[in-house]
């Protein structure tokens, strides 16, 4: 049966990538269908109940700047907020929020259920409609065909998903859900490179069986920060509660070591590679054998939940062993496990087979986003979903495309890393992956991306006005401060010298004075004659950072300008690299396989030398491909 409602875009999967993809597509105005195997699990946090962190918080802020839903949802559902690295520079500060699982899912559903142009249908997708190497729709398990101009696959860990607890294995996309084996087989029949990855989750513990009095208490920040640029004054956070910290010990490690042969990972049952930066507890004990203890964050799953998430204890050991090692940990001596931990293995497809828009190179109008591309984490998934949804929508009746770059966002870094380097392990975002960290800060994500969001129609009128007002206030106040002078031996100078190490000897602008480490905006406000009445903390923050880091920011902007030349030089998709004399066989093979879209992208493919890029540039200039 064909269920034809004239959809422009179909999004398959209702996780974090799917929600952002469907929401972005619908906000742009495309008639969008979200197909999910279970409407009740849309927006579900399958693993840890938290959003953000180092590098990840940057992604959430960027999704928000483009009108996405993740930041607003966590503002509605967050039960503890912290700014990580708050004592360090602004480039590496990151927001992290503990979530109430129930409230988060409720918030996501509220946001997408009120989204115009978006329909939701419950059924598993078993097949794709592909005609002349172009996707035209999706076929569900019950035999319903939905046709559309674009299809976005955001299927998480469901493709060929296999759950492992010790030596017991069963098919599953996550605990309690069936895998998408038919769709996995269909995708394997298409010309994509495919491999297996693994991730895992810890056992959940009944909080009533835990002794918190022997653990370290970890409180959130006060005042409580917001994730979204648009939430303050409109969204009220839920009640805030603490998390706790405990540690493994030698007894814990001995129990794990003595039972390694029973672990699915160490017994050879699991083929896929797990996440390097979120290893299982058995992996930690083996890889860091010299460490006497490992930190465990004891995280509540919600205000009204009795479940605790012991972050740091992901495992594939048998349930009996899980019980033993959990009870060896301080505070967990009488712990009751409510759900066993498990590892899950699943198919992923080589992201080097994708364009920067996340459209596949082999099947036209088909987009991949999330764990199908080899990433791990809600934030990485949401970021990809956003880009895929945008491009699916804006290219319906044209050849328009938009994708972020390494110079304007962490989303750009994420996608560029994936499509140029690929991945052999679950990819996680860190600030260290970005070259231009001082420019790609959490605090200025809206200033970097929201103009484009306005242009694409991704922001609501209210959010658009909020952004424009903030941007104008920053521009106007910086201009005023650059044109306001204080001369020596004036009353203003004498008032200012209370905060300085020495007397002023020359005339300075307020902006130059703000560059000094001992001066901040609040001190300038104390000089009554200056009449500095600005109260908006977000605007003040941008003014201070612009002044204090102006030299570094200027240098990074110059670096970006140098590399922009290569980024702007497009390579045709049918370009014949064998015509370029002097390229080695290795370079020729890699360029032919990956089909980079620009010289900049080509330069970042592992094994592509500067000499090869020079030869390519000379040939393209000589033959008229570039000027």
Curated annotation (Swiss-Prot):
Binding positions (FAD): 13-18, 125, 180, 371
Pfam annotation, one family: SAM_GIDA_C
Gene Ontology MF terms in the entry: flavin adenine dinucleotide binding
Keywords, ordered alphabetically: Cytoplasm, FAD, Flavoprotein, NAD, tRNA processing
Location within or outside the cell: Cytoplasm
Family matches, as PROSITE patterns: GIDA_1, GIDA_2
GO cellular component, one term: cytosol
InterPro entries assigned to the protein according to its UniProt record, in alphabetical order: FAD/NAD-bd_sf, GIDA_C_N, MnmG, MnmG-rel, MnmG-rel_CS, MnmG_C, MnmG_C_subdom, MnmG_C_subdom_sf
Quaternary data: Homodimer. Heterotetramer of two MnmE and two MnmG subunits.
Function: NAD-binding protein involved in the addition of a carboxymethylaminomethyl (cmnm) group at the wobble position (U34) of certain tRNAs, forming tRNA-cmnm(5)s(2)U34.
Identification of the protein by name: tRNA uridine 5-carboxymethylaminomethyl modification enzyme MnmG
Organism placement in taxonomy: Bacteria, Pseudomonadati, Pseudomonadota, Gammaproteobacteria, Thiotrichales
